[in-house]
Design a protein with these regions (language model features):
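Charged (often Lys/Glu-rich) extended helix/loop segments that serve as interaction or gating elements
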Residues: 223, 237-377
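A short small-residue
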Residues: 2-6, 164-170, 205
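N-terminal capping/small domains of soluble enzymes
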Residues: 1-75, 81-85, 270, 318-331, ...
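Acidic, glycine-rich loop-and-beta core segments that form the ion-binding/anion-interacting portion
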Residues: 186-242
Length: 377
């Protein structure tokens, strides 16, 4: 079927665009010899893992469930980092992960020997205290007082011999100039530890918008080579968004039109339920064939069927009047959508579909009342 024939609401993964992103990432790997992992926190649609696995080295996880998903569905390198690990989970994690990164030396001291006995490569996350985030403090791991990563003041030289690698993750949707700035801070504060003979790898985390049209890939590759050559380490990069950037849609139908001073489209999709970053970040998601408010002839506010007054996606304009029953297509909806959605107000989760490289769509998963009630008791 075609995309306009899909049931709504429905997420759609565009496999042609997904492959294009993967080809860009693989070229970085081929040019530099670095390793690239899928950060599953952004995109976990495992039916695409066979495709992703053709290009990338494996997966990285934020806890046990993601680690199990990567292990079972991709079966390549499997890394995990979490702010803390439960004692009840560490055994299973060491059975399925090759790399385990700790957030503190107290956790490393507790578990490192056990991990080593299981043949797991052990790392520590550092905080270079170099903030490059700008306006989005909620996504800044280097914000004052951040719980994420060990600062230089708290770095324990007495435990450094237990380490195999060092990890940092400070970026969010950023270009490689910010990585270059961050690396200078990492080298200044932690360079002497990177030079130790037991340190075999450096993981530069995610937030690298490598597949964005204006991303400076040449600078990224220079950064990677510099760290490889200076410290004789394997460099890992673990993008999430860059893997599936602009490779998905959320198809929604106009259910009603309300005008209480602002012409408002009531959609069967919701910002609060189906694209929570719209309210959390906040941001205005791209919408196919639309413009900014008042840019085109007909302007509408887009909202949803929930009772939340602030469940507003944004104001958009169109060349033609919108009618009840029309379908709209939000773009760049593969990332941080399905992994974060919810059933507030009893809203149904959108179906999930894939679009093959010829443009044909097939529904992979549908949801109903059963999924809603199963989570609640």
């Amino acid at each position: 079927m075609k995309i306009n024939e899909l049931p709504t609401p429905c997420y759609v993964i565009d496999e042609k665009k997904l492959r294009k992103n993967l080809e860009i990432l693989k070229k970085v790997k081929d040019d530099t010899g670095c390793k690239i992992l899928l950060a599953q926190k952004a995109f976990s649609n495992f039916f695409e893992y066979p495709l992703i696995g053709q290009y990338l080295d494996g997966t990285t996880a934020s806890g046990l469930f993601e680690a199990k998903l990567g292990y079972e569905k991709m079966g390549k390198e499997n890394h995990v980092f979490a702010p803390a690990f439960k004692e009840s989970e560490i055994g299973e994690l060491t059975d399925i992960c090759e790399h385990l990164v700790f957030n503190s030396f107290s956790q490393l001291e507790k578990y490192a020997d056990f991990c080593k006995e299981k043949g797991v490569s052990v790392g520590i996350r550092v905080n270079p205290e170099c903030s490059t985030q700008g306006d989005h403090a909620i996504y800044d791991p280097c914000a004052p007082g951040s719980r994420l990563g060990v600062t230089l003041a708290n770095f324990r030289e007495d435990l450094v011999e237990k380490l195999d690698g060092i990890h940092f993750h400070t970026l969010c949707e950023q270009n490689s100039d910010d990585l270059e700035t961050t690396l200078k801070a990492v080298e200044e504060k932690f360079g002497k530890y990177l030079k130790l003979p037991n340190i075999k790898w450096l993981n530069m985390g995610g937030g690298h918008h490598i597949t964005r049209s204006d991303y400076d890939i040449d600078r990224l590759e220079r950064c990677i080579r510099h760290m490889q050559e200076t410290y004789d380490v394997t460099v890992y990069v673990e993008p999430g968004e860059a893997v599936a950037l602009n490779a998905g849609y959320l198809v929604t139908e106009v259910m009603d039109i309300v005008d209480n001073g602002i012409r408002t489209l009531i959609l069967d999709a919701s910002a609060a339920c189906h694209m929570p970053d719209v309210l959390e970040m906040p941001y205005r998601p791209p919408l196919k064939d639309s413009g900014e408010a008042d840019e085109k002839q007909y302007t509408y506010r887009l909202s949803s069927m929930t009772c939340l007054a602030g469940d507003v996606i944004g104001d958009y304009s169109f060349d033609h009047e919108i009618q009840i029953g029309d379908k709209l297509y939000f773009e760049d909806m593969a990332i941080y959508s399905m992994v974060k959605n919810n059933t507030f107000n009893g809203m149904c989760l959108p179906s999930i579909a894939r679009m093959d490289e010829s443009g044909e769509c097939s529904v992979v998963k549908t949801f109903g009342y059963e999924e809603f009630v199963r989570r609640l008791g």
